[in-house]
């Protein structure tokens, strides 16, 4: 799977700035709930001030999710404004309405249409369909690929998810020739009983190794706490410049594998 060099550089710089505390309050990735920004029945935003705050965000990546963003008439305008401001956008959707609304978006290098796949999710039976993905989502992915869009799949794992089910989703993603894959724990599972939470974390880490890209693995780790709304972790006060330089060099080494 491919990982944009520009995104690699932006995330590396954001992580270094965060560890050096040059950008207080900023994360490499910021979550945006479409329902808090856009009206469900109008293309106008709820607040122009909120739009300005989002566009002015110091986070290089904005992840738009929440209740289905494609339900909002103004989502394409919001995405266009954010990408034009220099941010990368991951627009998460179930994919059900993707084919219907794909014509409203522009296939730019800073936009990843991100289709969420969950094992065990209801879907119509079809001989050409793998478990965990609806036919409409698959059709949407194919239509987006043909239109030149970058596609990422977001695989969410729950405690009951079997690795065999997750493997089928990975196989589906590769068969559709997607550009990237993010794997995270399902929302709401971070507060499970400790043994269950540890088992899920271990299962998620194991699944990420199957992505085949250290950069998409890294992005998965960065995205997960943002999606789960976990508190931001702060670097140790004793973090040295030498240690940060070593991490930066390790990041640079990883570029050649992207």
Give names to the regions the model predicted:
Residues 1, 116-118, 122-246, 251, ...:
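Radical SAM enzyme [4Fe-4S]-AdoMet core and its adjacent flexible, acidic
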Residues 1-27:
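Alpha-helical membrane-targeting segments
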Residues 17-52, 60-65, 241-248, 258:
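N-terminal pre-triad scaffold of radical SAM enzymes
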Residues 34-40, 49-52, 96-104, 148-149, ...:
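Residue-level detection of beta-strand scaffold positions
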Residues 43-51, 67-109, 117-122, 130-136, ...:
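Canonical radical SAM enzyme core domain
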Residues 53-56, 84, 103-110, 141-146, ...:
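Acidic (Asp/Glu)-rich catalytic clusters
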Residues 58-62, 82-88, 149-153:
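Short, surface-exposed connector motifs at secondary-structure boundaries
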Residues 62, 90-91, 113, 180-184:
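Hydrophobic residues within beta-strands of alpha/beta enzymes
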